[in-house]
Amino acid sequence: METKKNNSEYIPEFDKSFRHPRYWGAWLGVAAMAGIALTPPKFRDPILARLGRFAGRLGKSSRRRALINLSLCFPERSEAEREAIVDEMFATAPQAMAMMAELAIRGPEKIQPRVGWQGLEIIEEMRRNNEKVIFLVPHGWAVDIPAMLMASQGQKMAAMFHNQGNPVFDYVWNTVRRRFGGRLHARNDGIKPFIQSVRQGYWGYYLPDQDHGPEHSEFVDFFATYKATLPAIGRLMKVCRARVVPLFPIYDGKTHRLTIQVRPPMDDLLEADDHTIERRMNEEVEIFVGPRPEQYTWILKLLKTRKPGEIQPYKRKDLYPIK
Protein backbone atom coordinates (compact mmCIF):
# COMPACT_ATOMS: atom_id res chain seq x y z
CA MET A 1 0.00 0.00 0.00
CA GLU A 2 1.11 3.58 -0.41
CA THR A 3 0.30 7.17 0.38
CA LYS A 4 1.03 9.86 -2.17
CA LYS A 5 1.80 13.50 -1.48
CA ASN A 6 1.24 16.26 -4.05
CA ASN A 7 4.78 15.72 -5.33
CA SER A 8 3.89 12.06 -5.99
CA GLU A 9 6.34 10.89 -3.35
CA TYR A 10 5.92 7.20 -2.61
CA ILE A 11 5.66 6.34 1.09
CA PRO A 12 5.30 2.62 1.88
CA GLU A 13 2.66 1.82 4.48
CA PHE A 14 1.89 -1.39 6.32
CA ASP A 15 -1.38 -2.97 5.22
CA LYS A 16 -3.45 -5.26 7.44
CA SER A 17 -3.56 -7.82 4.64
CA PHE A 18 0.18 -8.40 5.16
CA ARG A 19 -0.77 -10.47 8.22
CA HIS A 20 -2.54 -13.04 6.03
CA PRO A 21 -1.00 -16.55 6.06
CA ARG A 22 -0.17 -16.27 2.36
CA TYR A 23 2.51 -13.75 3.30
CA TRP A 24 4.02 -15.70 6.20
CA GLY A 25 6.69 -17.14 3.93
CA ALA A 26 7.69 -13.64 2.85
CA TRP A 27 7.91 -12.50 6.47
CA LEU A 28 10.06 -15.51 7.33
CA GLY A 29 12.38 -14.49 4.51
CA VAL A 30 12.53 -10.93 5.86
CA ALA A 31 13.27 -12.22 9.38
CA ALA A 32 15.98 -14.52 8.03
CA MET A 33 17.65 -11.65 6.18
CA ALA A 34 17.50 -9.49 9.32
CA GLY A 35 19.15 -12.26 11.31
CA ILE A 36 21.82 -12.73 8.66
CA ALA A 37 22.46 -8.98 8.59
CA LEU A 38 23.31 -9.05 12.30
CA THR A 39 25.88 -11.79 11.75
CA PRO A 40 29.49 -10.61 11.32
CA PRO A 41 30.30 -10.38 7.59
CA LYS A 42 33.35 -12.63 7.86
CA PHE A 43 30.97 -15.45 8.83
CA ARG A 44 27.94 -14.59 6.70
CA ASP A 45 29.63 -13.75 3.39
CA PRO A 46 31.08 -17.23 2.69
CA ILE A 47 27.72 -18.82 3.57
CA LEU A 48 25.78 -16.35 1.42
CA ALA A 49 28.17 -16.92 -1.48
CA ARG A 50 27.52 -20.66 -1.39
CA LEU A 51 23.76 -20.15 -1.06
CA GLY A 52 23.78 -17.60 -3.87
CA ARG A 53 25.66 -19.89 -6.24
CA PHE A 54 23.29 -22.74 -5.38
CA ALA A 55 20.24 -20.53 -6.00
CA GLY A 56 21.80 -19.43 -9.28
CA ARG A 57 21.90 -23.04 -10.44
CA LEU A 58 18.24 -23.54 -9.51
CA GLY A 59 17.01 -20.28 -11.06
CA LYS A 60 17.37 -21.50 -14.62
CA SER A 61 15.50 -18.62 -16.29
CA SER A 62 17.53 -15.94 -14.51
CA ARG A 63 20.75 -17.80 -15.21
CA ARG A 64 19.83 -18.16 -18.88
CA ARG A 65 19.17 -14.41 -19.24
CA ALA A 66 22.51 -13.62 -17.62
CA LEU A 67 24.40 -16.03 -19.87
CA ILE A 68 22.69 -14.66 -22.98
CA ASN A 69 23.58 -11.09 -22.00
CA LEU A 70 27.18 -12.04 -21.31
CA SER A 71 27.53 -14.04 -24.53
CA LEU A 72 26.47 -10.97 -26.54
CA CYS A 73 28.44 -8.43 -24.50
CA PHE A 74 31.60 -10.51 -24.03
CA PRO A 75 31.85 -12.93 -26.98
CA GLU A 76 35.63 -12.98 -26.58
CA ARG A 77 35.33 -14.72 -23.21
CA SER A 78 35.16 -18.48 -22.99
CA GLU A 79 32.02 -20.29 -21.92
CA ALA A 80 33.73 -21.26 -18.66
CA GLU A 81 34.60 -17.61 -17.96
CA ARG A 82 31.02 -16.49 -18.52
CA GLU A 83 29.70 -19.28 -16.30
CA ALA A 84 32.13 -18.17 -13.59
CA ILE A 85 30.94 -14.56 -13.87
CA VAL A 86 27.34 -15.68 -13.41
CA ASP A 87 28.28 -17.79 -10.39
CA GLU A 88 30.07 -14.83 -8.81
CA MET A 89 27.14 -12.56 -9.63
CA PHE A 90 24.77 -14.84 -7.74
CA ALA A 91 27.27 -14.98 -4.87
CA THR A 92 27.56 -11.18 -4.74
CA ALA A 93 23.81 -10.49 -4.80
CA PRO A 94 22.92 -11.77 -1.28
CA GLN A 95 26.15 -10.38 0.19
CA ALA A 96 25.30 -6.87 -1.01
CA MET A 97 21.68 -7.22 0.15
CA ALA A 98 22.88 -8.30 3.60
CA MET A 99 25.06 -5.20 3.87
CA MET A 100 22.07 -3.05 2.91
CA ALA A 101 19.99 -4.74 5.62
CA GLU A 102 22.83 -4.29 8.12
CA LEU A 103 22.98 -0.59 7.28
CA ALA A 104 19.24 -0.22 7.86
CA ILE A 105 19.23 -2.15 11.15
CA ARG A 106 22.52 -1.15 12.77
CA GLY A 107 23.05 2.28 11.25
CA PRO A 108 25.82 3.80 9.11
CA GLU A 109 28.41 4.02 11.88
CA LYS A 110 28.61 0.21 12.00
CA ILE A 111 29.43 -0.25 8.31
CA GLN A 112 31.43 2.93 7.63
CA PRO A 113 34.76 1.23 8.50
CA ARG A 114 34.06 -1.21 5.64
CA VAL A 115 33.14 1.47 3.08
CA GLY A 116 35.66 3.22 0.89
CA TRP A 117 34.98 6.07 -1.54
CA GLN A 118 37.03 6.66 -4.68
CA GLY A 119 36.41 10.20 -5.89
CA LEU A 120 34.71 11.45 -2.72
CA GLU A 121 36.27 14.86 -3.33
CA ILE A 122 33.94 15.25 -6.35
CA ILE A 123 30.87 14.86 -4.14
CA GLU A 124 32.28 17.10 -1.42
CA GLU A 125 32.93 19.87 -3.95
CA MET A 126 29.35 19.60 -5.25
CA ARG A 127 28.06 19.86 -1.70
CA ARG A 128 30.23 22.89 -0.90
CA ASN A 129 29.02 24.65 -4.04
CA ASN A 130 25.39 23.73 -3.32
CA GLU A 131 25.04 22.26 -6.82
CA LYS A 132 22.19 20.18 -8.17
CA VAL A 133 23.35 16.64 -8.92
CA ILE A 134 22.01 13.58 -10.72
CA PHE A 135 24.00 10.41 -10.15
CA LEU A 136 24.21 8.05 -13.12
CA VAL A 137 24.27 4.64 -11.42
CA PRO A 138 24.52 1.33 -13.32
CA HIS A 139 22.25 -1.30 -11.80
CA GLY A 140 24.65 -3.15 -9.52
CA TRP A 141 23.62 -5.35 -6.61
CA ALA A 142 24.68 -2.78 -4.00
CA VAL A 143 23.01 0.06 -5.87
CA ASP A 144 20.92 1.40 -2.96
CA ILE A 145 23.69 1.61 -0.35
CA PRO A 146 25.48 4.80 -1.53
CA ALA A 147 22.18 6.73 -1.61
CA MET A 148 21.30 5.49 1.89
CA LEU A 149 24.73 6.50 3.19
CA MET A 150 24.48 9.98 1.70
CA ALA A 151 20.95 10.35 3.11
CA SER A 152 22.22 9.30 6.55
CA GLN A 153 24.68 12.21 6.37
CA GLY A 154 21.86 14.69 5.79
CA GLN A 155 21.99 14.87 2.00
CA LYS A 156 18.49 14.97 0.49
CA MET A 157 18.18 12.15 -2.06
CA ALA A 158 15.50 11.29 -4.65
CA ALA A 159 15.23 8.13 -6.72
CA MET A 160 12.84 6.37 -9.08
CA PHE A 161 11.95 2.71 -8.63
CA HIS A 162 9.83 -0.21 -9.81
CA ASN A 163 7.43 -1.91 -7.41
CA GLN A 164 8.29 -5.46 -6.32
CA GLY A 165 5.86 -8.22 -7.29
CA ASN A 166 5.37 -9.33 -3.68
CA PRO A 167 3.68 -6.53 -1.68
CA VAL A 168 5.43 -7.51 1.57
CA PHE A 169 8.86 -7.41 -0.05
CA ASP A 170 7.88 -4.13 -1.73
CA TYR A 171 6.89 -2.62 1.62
CA VAL A 172 10.02 -3.80 3.43
CA TRP A 173 12.46 -3.00 0.61
CA ASN A 174 11.20 0.55 0.14
CA THR A 175 10.98 1.14 3.89
CA VAL A 176 14.65 0.18 4.09
CA ARG A 177 15.48 2.51 1.19
CA ARG A 178 13.80 5.40 3.05
CA ARG A 179 15.41 4.49 6.38
CA PHE A 180 17.46 7.70 6.50
CA GLY A 181 15.12 9.98 4.58
CA GLY A 182 14.86 11.01 0.96
CA ARG A 183 12.14 10.62 -1.62
CA LEU A 184 11.07 7.65 -3.71
CA HIS A 185 9.16 8.16 -6.94
CA ALA A 186 7.37 5.27 -8.63
CA ARG A 187 8.19 4.99 -12.33
CA ASN A 188 4.46 4.60 -12.98
CA ASP A 189 4.06 8.25 -11.93
CA GLY A 190 6.32 9.44 -14.75
CA ILE A 191 9.47 11.54 -14.67
CA LYS A 192 7.97 14.88 -13.54
CA PRO A 193 7.98 14.19 -9.76
CA PHE A 194 11.65 13.21 -9.97
CA ILE A 195 12.46 16.41 -11.88
CA GLN A 196 10.59 18.45 -9.29
CA SER A 197 12.60 16.90 -6.47
CA VAL A 198 15.94 17.59 -8.17
CA ARG A 199 14.91 21.18 -8.84
CA GLN A 200 14.10 21.48 -5.13
CA GLY A 201 17.66 20.52 -4.22
CA TYR A 202 17.38 16.76 -3.83
CA TRP A 203 20.25 14.86 -5.39
CA GLY A 204 18.83 12.51 -8.00
CA TYR A 205 19.66 8.84 -8.42
CA TYR A 206 19.16 7.64 -11.99
CA LEU A 207 19.64 4.07 -13.27
CA PRO A 208 20.27 4.06 -17.05
CA ASP A 209 19.87 0.33 -17.73
CA GLN A 210 16.16 -0.07 -18.47
CA ASP A 211 15.11 -1.03 -22.00
CA HIS A 212 12.37 1.48 -22.90
CA GLY A 213 11.58 -0.04 -26.28
CA PRO A 214 12.20 1.34 -29.78
CA GLU A 215 9.80 4.31 -29.73
CA HIS A 216 12.03 6.83 -27.96
CA SER A 217 15.37 5.00 -27.93
CA GLU A 218 18.26 4.65 -30.34
CA PHE A 219 20.40 1.59 -30.94
CA VAL A 220 23.80 2.40 -29.50
CA ASP A 221 26.96 0.36 -28.90
CA PHE A 222 27.00 -1.48 -25.59
CA PHE A 223 30.09 -3.61 -24.94
CA ALA A 224 30.38 -5.91 -28.01
CA THR A 225 26.71 -5.60 -28.98
CA TYR A 226 24.16 -2.76 -29.03
CA LYS A 227 21.34 -1.65 -26.78
CA ALA A 228 18.17 0.42 -27.09
CA THR A 229 19.23 3.47 -25.11
CA LEU A 230 17.22 6.51 -24.05
CA PRO A 231 19.07 9.88 -23.93
CA ALA A 232 17.10 10.86 -20.82
CA ILE A 233 20.08 11.88 -18.71
CA GLY A 234 21.03 14.67 -21.14
CA ARG A 235 17.53 16.07 -21.04
CA LEU A 236 17.33 15.74 -17.26
CA MET A 237 20.56 17.65 -16.69
CA LYS A 238 19.23 20.53 -18.80
CA VAL A 239 15.71 20.59 -17.37
CA CYS A 240 16.96 20.22 -13.78
CA ARG A 241 20.05 22.40 -14.31
CA ALA A 242 22.02 19.61 -12.67
CA ARG A 243 25.43 18.04 -13.16
CA VAL A 244 25.56 14.33 -13.94
CA VAL A 245 28.01 12.29 -11.87
CA PRO A 246 28.64 8.59 -12.63
CA LEU A 247 28.74 6.37 -9.53
CA PHE A 248 29.04 2.62 -8.98
CA PRO A 249 29.24 0.50 -5.80
CA ILE A 250 31.35 -2.68 -5.68
CA TYR A 251 30.97 -5.24 -2.89
CA ASP A 252 33.90 -7.57 -2.28
CA GLY A 253 32.79 -10.71 -0.46
CA LYS A 254 36.39 -11.68 0.35
CA THR A 255 37.33 -8.43 2.12
CA HIS A 256 33.72 -7.69 3.19
CA ARG A 257 34.16 -4.13 1.98
CA LEU A 258 32.13 -1.84 -0.26
CA THR A 259 33.99 0.45 -2.64
CA ILE A 260 31.97 3.32 -4.11
CA GLN A 261 33.54 4.62 -7.31
CA VAL A 262 32.73 8.19 -8.35
CA ARG A 263 33.81 9.54 -11.73
CA PRO A 264 34.08 13.15 -12.94
CA PRO A 265 30.88 14.99 -13.91
CA MET A 266 29.70 14.44 -17.48
CA ASP A 267 29.72 18.14 -18.34
CA ASP A 268 30.50 17.27 -21.97
CA LEU A 269 26.85 16.27 -22.42
CA LEU A 270 25.53 19.83 -22.17
CA GLU A 271 26.01 20.55 -25.88
CA ALA A 272 25.95 16.95 -27.14
CA ASP A 273 23.39 15.45 -29.50
CA ASP A 274 21.19 12.52 -28.46
CA HIS A 275 23.39 9.84 -30.03
CA THR A 276 26.48 11.14 -28.24
CA ILE A 277 24.60 11.29 -24.94
CA GLU A 278 23.39 7.71 -25.33
CA ARG A 279 26.84 6.42 -26.19
CA ARG A 280 28.41 8.28 -23.27
CA MET A 281 25.86 6.75 -20.90
CA ASN A 282 26.69 3.26 -22.12
CA GLU A 283 30.39 4.08 -22.03
CA GLU A 284 30.20 4.92 -18.33
CA VAL A 285 28.46 1.59 -17.68
CA GLU A 286 31.26 -0.18 -19.57
CA ILE A 287 33.97 1.63 -17.59
CA PHE A 288 32.44 0.57 -14.28
CA VAL A 289 31.18 -2.90 -15.14
CA GLY A 290 33.90 -4.14 -17.49
CA PRO A 291 36.52 -4.78 -14.76
CA ARG A 292 33.95 -6.22 -12.28
CA PRO A 293 31.13 -7.81 -14.31
CA GLU A 294 29.92 -9.91 -11.37
CA GLN A 295 28.64 -6.71 -9.72
CA TYR A 296 26.06 -6.05 -12.46
CA THR A 297 22.48 -7.35 -12.64
CA TRP A 298 22.89 -9.41 -15.81
CA ILE A 299 19.61 -11.21 -15.05
CA LEU A 300 17.66 -8.23 -16.45
CA LYS A 301 16.36 -8.22 -20.03
CA LEU A 302 18.89 -5.57 -20.97
CA LEU A 303 18.92 -6.42 -24.68
CA LYS A 304 15.22 -7.07 -25.25
CA THR A 305 14.69 -4.52 -28.03
CA ARG A 306 16.49 -5.46 -31.24
CA LYS A 307 16.75 -4.04 -34.73
CA PRO A 308 14.00 -4.90 -37.25
CA GLY A 309 14.23 -8.50 -38.39
CA GLU A 310 16.32 -9.63 -35.43
CA ILE A 311 14.77 -12.02 -32.91
CA GLN A 312 14.81 -11.00 -29.26
CA PRO A 313 17.70 -13.04 -27.78
CA TYR A 314 15.67 -14.29 -24.82
CA LYS A 315 13.18 -15.88 -27.24
CA ARG A 316 15.84 -17.68 -29.26
CA LYS A 317 15.64 -21.39 -28.59
CA ASP A 318 19.22 -21.95 -29.75
CA LEU A 319 20.68 -19.79 -26.97
CA TYR A 320 21.16 -21.69 -23.72
CA PRO A 321 18.03 -23.88 -23.91
CA ILE A 322 16.70 -24.77 -20.47
CA LYS A 323 17.05 -28.49 -19.87
From Swiss-Prot:
<feature type="short sequence motif" description="HXXXXD motif">
    <location>
        <begin position="139"/>
        <end position="144"/>
    </location>
</feature>
<keyword id="KW-0997">Cell inner membrane</keyword>
<protein>
    <recommendedName>
        <fullName>Lipid A biosynthesis acyltransferase 1</fullName>
        <ecNumber>2.3.1.243</ecNumber>
    </recommendedName>
</protein>
<keyword id="KW-1133">Transmembrane helix</keyword>
<comment type="similarity">
    <text>Belongs to the LpxL/LpxM/LpxP family. LpxM subfamily.</text>
</comment>
<dbReference type="GO" id="GO:0009276">
    <property type="term" value="C:Gram-negative-bacterium-type cell wall"/>
</dbReference>
<comment type="function">
    <text>Catalyzes the transfer of an acyl chain from an acyl-[acyl-carrier-protein] (ACP) to a Kdo(2)-(acyl)-lipid IV(A) to form a Kdo(2)-lipid A.</text>
</comment>
<comment type="pathway">
    <text>Bacterial outer membrane biogenesis; lipopolysaccharide biosynthesis.</text>
</comment>
<keyword id="KW-0448">Lipopolysaccharide biosynthesis</keyword>
<dbReference type="GO" id="GO:0005886">
    <property type="term" value="C:plasma membrane"/>
</dbReference>
<feature type="transmembrane region" description="Helical">
    <location>
        <begin position="23"/>
        <end position="43"/>
    </location>
</feature>
<dbReference type="GO" id="GO:0009103">
    <property type="term" value="P:lipopolysaccharide biosynthetic process"/>
</dbReference>
<keyword id="KW-0812">Transmembrane</keyword>
<comment type="pathway">
    <text>Glycolipid biosynthesis; KDO(2)-lipid A biosynthesis; KDO(2)-lipid A from CMP-3-deoxy-D-manno-octulosonate and lipid IV(A): step 4/4.</text>
</comment>
<dbReference type="Pfam" id="PF03279">
    <property type="entry name" value="Lip_A_acyltrans"/>
</dbReference>
<keyword id="KW-0012">Acyltransferase</keyword>
<keyword id="KW-0808">Transferase</keyword>
<dbReference type="GO" id="GO:0016747">
    <property type="term" value="F:acyltransferase activity, transferring groups other than amino-acyl groups"/>
</dbReference>
<keyword id="KW-0472">Membrane</keyword>
<dbReference type="GO" id="GO:0036104">
    <property type="term" value="P:Kdo2-lipid A biosynthetic process"/>
</dbReference>
<keyword id="KW-1003">Cell membrane</keyword>
<dbReference type="InterPro" id="IPR004960">
    <property type="entry name" value="LipA_acyltrans"/>
</dbReference>
<dbReference type="InterPro" id="IPR011921">
    <property type="entry name" value="Lipid_A_MsbB"/>
</dbReference>
